[in-house]
Amino acid sequence: LAPPINLPKWLKDNASLLQPPINNYCVYDKDMTVMIVGGPNARTDYHINETPEWFYQYRGAMLLKVVVDGAGFRDVVIHEGSFFLLPPGVPHNPVRFANTVGIVIELPRPAGSVDRLRWYCTACEGGVVVHEAAFHCTHLGSQIKAAVQDFAADEEKRTCHKCLRLADAAPAPGSIPDPNLEPGDELRVKEE
């Protein structure tokens, strides 16, 4: 039986473990995967998981970019103190901003399940897929990071077959509006 985790103390003692591009650390990975995730992250992929994912924002707001069948691309803002249950099979890109912290809970992957990371062309209409990586996820903390780094290092994988534009491996600084900022205001999320 694992001891309880005091989240503020854990963050103070282990902030260095939350590193780009994913910024996550698995604190439990037996019956469920429980991750502490910090910001900012640096990823442009959309993760597709065959099981649901539960997001809770402990500090600051995050943006969950999703692709919904029939509705296209949508943004879901998850504010500090709020949680959100993402259904299985929904492509999603978790965007985390500076000084934010959340918790994500996932179920163990069933035998034969396949996780996918998908990159879309931002220049083409209609959700043109630039590249998709597929794998059976056995270690969330390392496999997603490896796939993101592999995409970033390979211009062929990053080239859109339709418009030949090179897809970004990381968002351009300031390209995604931070819900923690108000125009002209200071950052509302405080460092602890």
Predicted features by range, described:
Residues L1-Q57, A61-F83, P91-E192:
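Jelly-roll (double-stranded beta-helix
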